[in-house]
Amino acid sequence: MVLVLGVWAGGGCGRKTGEQMDAGRFEGSVYRNDYLGLVMTLPADWHIQDPQSVQEGVKTGEKIIAGKNENMLAAMEANQAKTLNLVSVFKFPMGAPVAYNPQFNCVAEEVSHLPGIQTGGDYLFHAKRNLESSQMRFSFPRDMYVETLAGVEFHVLTARLALLPTKIITNEYLATVRKGYTLLFILSYSTEEERTELRNILNTMTLAALPPAKTTK
């Protein structure tokens, strides 16, 4: 399960757009993923991370969360082959002299090989257990809940991390299962004002309607 950012991965060639999962594309500040039917608009003055920076952040984050737990680190690394980082954007440039740099991430992880994961709640159940097992002391201020975004049900998990006695970072994980992938948004903030800015990005999202599931006679 994804605890930090996923790895950037490219799509296949020789297929029509939308037939196979890929990392999507940016058109200015608009992100599109035809396979998932996902479109969203990012603030023009926010800072999109390049694939190399994302991958470096992934490796660092995995080591911090896993600590000395080699089994957890190995599991995270194994999941990278099935994970695509679609969007990673910060409000300020990396290294800016600010108290906290709000971050918006969108990740897709293949789960078609895991028949027990049918909903975002199933996915986040395992993600929460992994967070609880990490060396970092996450707390969960409320139970997981369901929220409808762009006409689609997402399960939401809120996790908090006290970096200092007076500094609390909140991560909101919003997940749904779509065409064999968990579509996961991660909003990271330290104030309600920052949360509102991240939620405003999320509210630009549209998701194309999926064809009805096939029924067996």
What are these regions (language model features)?
Residues 1-8:
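Bacterial N-terminal signal peptides
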Residues 8-100, 112, 132-153, 163-169, ...:
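N-terminal targeting sequences that direct proteins away from the cytosol to non-cytosolic compartments
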Residues 41, 106, 122, 126, ...:
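Extracytoplasmic/secreted proteins, especially bacterial periplasmic and envelope-associated proteins
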Residues 108-122, 127-140:
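Mid-length scaffold segments of soluble, non-membrane domains
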Residues 157:
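Nucleotide and nucleotide-moiety/phosphate-recognizing core
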Residues 172-174:
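Extracellular C-type lectin-like domains
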